[in-house]
């Protein structure tokens, strides 16, 4: 049964969230968003996502009308119904894009890049997930990112904030 919040229709519903996020080409920049097979949720207020877990959530879905970026709903977490760790064999595909914006911005304090090097083989991607690059892929990875070219890779989960590249598509 819908409820109304400040004249806008809100619905309480149960949704699933996949154990990974994906790179979305947003209006003026790229970002990581949730993958939900049964909702349009890309971000959920008050939800603390960890990589490598399937989630079932109870959320409030607030209809806000069509925004310029295509967004129609806002989501806020009411309850985590379940949080299930993936098996060690799960592999997922993700696009890695080294550029945050479609055109480089020359403004001070703006980071044009999505990758920050943490050590010789680990990078922080979009300030959200650490990516381990095994030695056999480092040359390919550096060539692509130095030339500001994205690539698709297959990844495994290491822990709630780290993934490992296992193959290149």
Label every model-predicted segment.
Residues 1-9:
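Bacterial Sec-dependent N-terminal signal peptides
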Residues 8-28, 89-117:
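Structural detector for short beta-strands of small beta-barrel domains
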Residues 37-47:
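N-terminal post-signal-peptidase region of extra-cytosolic proteins
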Residues 55-64, 143-161:
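Flexible glycine-rich surface loops and low-complexity tracts that mediate binding to linear polymers
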Residues 63-76, 159-167:
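Short, Lys/Arg- and Gly-enriched loop/turn segments at beta-strand edges
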Residues 70, 79-98:
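A surface/extracellular/periplasmic glyco- and lipid-processing/surface-interacting theme
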Residues 111-156:
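N-terminal accessory interaction module
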């Amino acid at each position: 049964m819908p409820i109304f919040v400040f004249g806008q229709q809100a619905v309480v519903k149960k949704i699933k969230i996949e154990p990974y996020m994906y790179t979305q080409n947003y209006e003026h920049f790229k970002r990581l968003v949730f993958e939900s097979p049964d909702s349009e949720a890309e971000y959920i207020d008050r939800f603390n996502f960890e990589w490598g877990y399937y989630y079932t959530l109870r959320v409030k879905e607030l209809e806000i009308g069509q925004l310029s970026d295509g967004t129609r709903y806002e989501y806020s977490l009411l309850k985590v119904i379940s949080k299930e760790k993936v098996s060690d064999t799960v592999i997922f595909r993700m696009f890695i894009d080294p550029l945050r914006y479609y055109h480089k911005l020359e403004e001070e304090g703006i980071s044009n890049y999505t990758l920050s090097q943490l050590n010789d083989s680990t990078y922080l991607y979009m300030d959200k997930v650490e990516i381990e690059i095994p030695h056999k892929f480092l040359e390919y990875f550096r060539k692509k990112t130095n030339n500001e070219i994205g690539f698709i890779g297959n990844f495994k989960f290491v822990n709630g904030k780290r993934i490992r590249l296992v193959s290149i598509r």
